[in-house]
């Protein structure tokens, strides 16, 4: 099972990029369903990520980043690298998807995906608003195309 989860805040411009990509994938899969592919819009609910990922073989997380890199930069990060980060506090008010990776592995063990990839797109504008900036929209289109290839490969297997 492949699970793709989009994260972000739809009311903060580029922060919505992960959710917007996930919604596009959901529209595609509504027309072209496949029983071994699930796509979720988790918004800002990190706890949902942990439960939605459970039972999957492969997990892909989509989100915006704010690292100081060039706007629109795409980072493809193996989940294992993110699990090496310091132990989170697990405060439920601050529980994010990166906490879900660590907690999910501890709680669910082998029932949590071993193969995790995180796509991050560097934001240009995180102010309140409903639009992706042009450079982030372009990067979202590139990530969407790559994910469509991954979906097609999973459909064929």
Give the ranges of each region predicted by the language model.
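N-terminal catalytic or cofactor-binding beta/alpha core of small enzyme domains
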Residues: 1-114, 118-123, 130-141, 150-157
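Hydrophobic "lid"/C-terminal helical patch
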Residues: 147
